[in-house]
Amino acid sequence: MIQKSLGLLVMAAFFSFSCSNSNPPKPKLVITLVVDQMRPDLLTRFDDLYTGGFRWLMDHGIWFTNTHHEHSYTATGPGHFAIGFGQYPGHAGVIGNSFYDRDMKKEVNCVEDPNAKVIGAEEGKARSSSRYNMTGLGDWVKSTYPHSKVISLGGKDRSAIFMGGQKPDLPLYYNYAGSFISSDFYLDVLPDWVNDFNENLNAESYKDSLWTKSLPEDVYLKYAREDFFQGELDDYLNEDYSPVFPIGIDSSEDPKEFLMGRPWFEREILKLAQSAITNEELGQDGNPDLLFIGFSAMDWMIHDFGPHSQEIMDAFIKLEKYLGNFIEFVDENVGLEMYYLHLREIMADYHFLNMWLSRAEPLAASINII
């Protein structure tokens, strides 16, 4: 397993982009975008279809195709830790998304903090980086520029916590109950603008929403496999199995939780990032600010449908549009020449080559022969 994981890591690419300028001024805002479980081919395979954010990044930036993390195991926690802390996760003790704690005598989440309290909502779990005695990129910047701000946003708690370093000004993660929350390890109360955002999020309103295709049917048949594919998730569990578009939410499920499994969640987290830029006045003075954005819903969707599915193709088409709008917003509010934007993909727990359930029936038949 280790050799296979290392092989995947070596073949995976990190993509980093920056505004082209031979002598750029010192950036006022550095934005890091991390797409959870984004394989390199999800950029190249749909290259002809991209017209928004990915297109802008590939056309205007520097593209590094032969870089990788020299660590395993490749889960969300270790991957985001490597990005935010710039260190090998295993050496720091981040050996997975969860692990056995000898002192507590139980399995713990990698960002679990029994001494912290949730702020921002009644639901959710308090998370922090308190169990790791080291600093990260955000801390290094703030040690040189004390008035710089470090804000880290993610759907997953470990995404937001690890990207921001040891003590970001504001890490926010989704509580699967309709709110972005944090813990009192970082601050006592959430800023008013975050509370306002949570009130306006209204995740319940997505209950009757349908996920439909953005492009004509023949385009999906050209770039992805057939829509009906054995092993993909079908949310309508009370009906005949049919994992195809349009995709809704089963009436028995909580839309506030399942919002994380839809492309719309990535749109909401970019709206949250825009609110952070506006209300925290990021990139508006001589102190460079850092903004980390983790697209965690992509991991959920790739687990549900697989990277070759029409659903993932459509999810990336939608994300590319959302990113295009976000880049336009940053240009208007910070200035093209005053920010540095880079996109990074991380190896999550594993990358699907195909949906494993599609092999279940042939495997069962082979076993029954024995």
Q: Where do the language-model regions lie?
A:
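Active-site-proximal N-terminal segment of extracellular/periplasmic enzymes that hydrolyze or transfer
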Residues: N21-I62, L357
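Second-shell loop/turn segments in exported
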Residues: R39-R45, H69, E123-S128, K256-P263, ...
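Metal-dependent active-site segment of extracytoplasmic phospho-/sulfohydrolases and closely related
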Residues: K318-R359
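Structural recognition of the beta-strand scaffold that forms the well-ordered cores
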Residues: V30-V34, D41, W56, F64-T67, ...
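Short, structured active-site-proximal loop/turn typified by the sulfatase FGly-forming signature C/S-X-P-X-R
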Residues: T44-H91, H147-L153
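His/Asp/Glu-rich, glycine-adjacent segments
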Residues: G96-N287, S296-H303
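Bacterial Sec-dependent N-terminal signal peptides
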Residues: M1-K26
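Short secondary-structure boundary/capping segments
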Residues: D47-Y50, G165-A177, F305-M313, A348-I370
